[in-house]
Amino acid sequence: MKKAKMTAAALAAFFAFAAAPVLDAEFAGTDSVAELNGISAISFSRPAYAQAQEAVDYSTSLQYLPLTTHTQYFVDKDEKGVLLRSHWTAVGVIPFDYQGPKQPVQTMKNALGNYSRHEGKSFEKSRGKLLSDAKKDRRERLANGSTFFGPYQEDGDIFVRRADFRVVSFLEDGYTFLGGAHGLGGVAGRNFDVHTGRELKLTDVVRDKTQLAEAIKQQLMFDYPQSSFAQSGGGSMKGIVDQLIREDKMLWSLDPRGISFYFNPYLLGSYAEGIFTTTIFFSERPELFVKNAASDIIEWRGPQAYCMEIRPYFTMRLSDSPRDEKLFIANDKDRIIIEYCGEKLEDYVNNKEIRPVLINTYDGKKYLYVDYAEVTNNFRLRVYDLNGASPKLVGEYPMTRLASSPQDQANRKWYIMSDPNEFYMRSTKDTNLVPLKRLTCRVGKDGVPEVYEVEGAKG
């Protein structure tokens, strides 16, 4: 499609408001998915924070890789009712204009295409078995005189942590319900070397797994002082971490600023305690990480500016700052809840789902972009500022990362933000100037999204 830049006046008119009603975001011509000896004491007050920061030369020239995810939804039922609800998610590279070497792009197209095809086949196999099990379960319940049957459920989502010309890293977020009191959810990290397309091992990134294990154990004790494992002295947790490291079964993601580790329910604590997660940053433990032989800089460091999807209900460390910079975001039906550096914001807005993205700009400012769904399934964007004493709402804008129609109950496609200076959104119907168009945007002043190209615009 033909593209043209909008004038400053038009852009100002387009986004010169903080909130607006929204109808729906139709899908029009969107590209589909194709296919850690010797560190017995860490100073958690971190008095040398500023000096440690200088140890990492984050890249200012690393090319970003634009991705999209595609979730397919299924409802299996018969004349007696619903048996199984399920969905799975694929991930792929969006075609984009890039004049440099094509090899990294093609390599990741192939790698993510292979990943998605494998996951699709695995999902279909699992779906078939679950459907058979659900039929058997319901039949046995009826035979025993019970008329209640809660449909089985299997969900598979993806949250992209990093996407650039060095690393693509994302979380697989799964949930299964097979009857009983509750289902069971968990995450797993997938980390790809963009130059080779192969999945990275922890030993590709860290120099000494024993040192890494000690760092993880100490950080978990610091991050979760009220947890059941900390209250009992941490012995069981330490044994589990050692075992996971020794057996290469640690779940992790390679983020722009370090490595995050994930411990699913029941592994370190009770089901109610949920998923434990912690991050070891390049800047706080630079000696842990593999360095480039020629430049002596950390091999897998990320770009200076980045965007990162945040899974709701996770508490994430964002830096090794003495400020104890942690972020938690969740939602209830009438509010979006954000906790940052110990301060809490309850933003009262009716919603049924959220999809948050953390943004770190070149000048070090942090913002949250949160796509949220109304009860009608229509999505809109709310922006939050994380740079003051407490999080605050910047505004609401007639755009969304949802690239498909909210009325399509079988498919959902999302644009993935990786570069704060260039990312895709789609305008909504209530935008009279350019409704239902793909927008090329950047993060502007105070976190406000600025549009600088509109798909199909003339003039």
Say what each PLM segment does.
Residues 3-26:
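Sec-dependent N-terminal signal peptides of Gram-positive bacterial secreted proteins and lipoproteins
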Residues 368-370:
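Gram-negative (and chloroplast) outer-membrane scaffold detector with strong preference
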Residues 351-359, 399-416:
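Repeated scaffold domains used in trafficking and secretory/extracellular systems
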Residues 42, 53-60, 392, 400-409:
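Sequence termini and other peripheral, non-core segments
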Residues 200, 392-394:
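A structural motif specific to WD40 beta-propellers
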Residues 26-29, 33-319, 328-361, 372-381, ...:
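Compositionally biased intrinsically disordered regions enriched in Thr/Gly
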Residues 324, 365-366, 421:
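Short coil/turn segments that connect the beta-strands within blades of beta-propeller domains
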Residues 195, 387-389:
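Short loop/turn segments that connect beta-strands within beta-propeller blades
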